[in-house]
């Protein structure tokens, strides 16, 4: 399997993990959201895509509310 093929597989897996994370959050399944968000972060780290974290705004809102 070539690096290009691996990148394509990881890109699809990243998209799926993001979709599942947002879907989980929209249904108040917070633990499941955390699971899929963590999967996304892990896949993003091992891929060469370096995508920006789609959950950053959620984290920033949580930090504001915490204070």
Predicted regions and their residues:
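Short, charge-rich amphipathic alpha-helical segments embedded
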Residues: 34-59
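Short, charge-rich, low-complexity alpha-helical interaction segments
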Residues: 1-8, 60-67
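Short amphipathic alpha-helical heptad-repeat segments
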Residues: 6-18
């Amino acid at each position: 399997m070539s690096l290009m093929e691996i990148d394509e597989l990881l890109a699809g897996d990243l998209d799926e993990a993001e979709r599942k994370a947002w879907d989980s959050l929209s249904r108040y399944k917070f633990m499941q959201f955390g699971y899929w968000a963590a999967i996304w972060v892990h896949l993003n780290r091992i891929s060469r895509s370096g995508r920006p974290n789609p959950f950053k705004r959620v984290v920033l809102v949580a930090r504001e509310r915490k204070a």
